[in-house]
C-alpha cells in the first residue's frame, strides 16, 4: 500500500544532464508531516492506515472536535489531513515526523493529487474537446453543443451530459510520474513533467498505485539514464532558487 506526504507545488523548471539535455521537472516542497493517527485492523477502525497532517493552524480556524483530536494524539494543530492505506502501521506512532527521504527516493514512480487550475465558464469545445460543427455551408452552430435531449422516453437530459459549464478547479490525480531527484536539505523532490494546480497550491504525493504495471516498469527502466547522468549541483540550485 502506498505512503505519501502533503506538500506544495513550487513551480516548473528544468534540470540539465551532463551532456546538456534539458529535462522539465516540477519542484514540490514538503513542510513537516506528522503522523496524527495510526489505524489498525486490530482496533475498532478495522483497517490499516496512517492519518498524516501538515501545515500548522490557529485554534480559531478549527472545530472543537478537531482540536481535541490533535491534542489526544499529541501533535500540533494542523490545517491539512490525509489518510494513506499502509501494510505496516505498527512501524509508525502518533506524533512521528516524516521527512521526504523516509518516503521517496530517486527513480520512484509517484501519483500526485491536486486541485486543477480554475478556468471559469467554458464552452463544450474547450471544456470537453468537442470537434464542433463544419466551418461553413450556411449554418450558425460552429461551436454549439448540438442535440442534448432524448425522445418522449425518457424525455429529459441524462445526468452527466457533457455541456458548457465551470471548467477546472476540480480534484485531479496524475499517475506514474518519475522522481528525478530527492533533496533532503530542502525537503523537496523533483518530478518529471507537470502536476495539477497552480504554484503554491497544496498537493498530495504518494508512492504510485500503478507501479506494478508492465508499462510503468518499462518507463521506470527507460528513465534511469536521467538519474545516472544528472548534474547534482544543477538540481540543488533549482531547489534553492
Swiss-Prot record:
Q: Name one Pfam family in it.
A: Ribosomal_L3
Q: Name one GO cellular component term.
A: cytosolic large ribosomal subunit
Does the keyword section mention rRNA-binding?
yes
Q: Which InterPro entries match?
A: Ribosomal_uL3, Ribosomal_uL3_bac/org-type, Ribosomal_uL3_CS, Transl_B-barrel_sf
Q: Per the similarity annotation, which family is this?
A: Belongs to the universal ribosomal protein uL3 family.
The annotated subunit structure for this chain is: Part of the 50S ribosomal subunit. Forms a cluster with proteins L14 and L19.
Chain's role: One of the primary rRNA binding proteins, it binds directly near the 3'-end of the 23S rRNA, where it nucleates assembly of the 50S subunit.
- The name this protein goes by in its record: Large ribosomal subunit protein uL3
Which gene does this sequence derive from? Answer: rplC
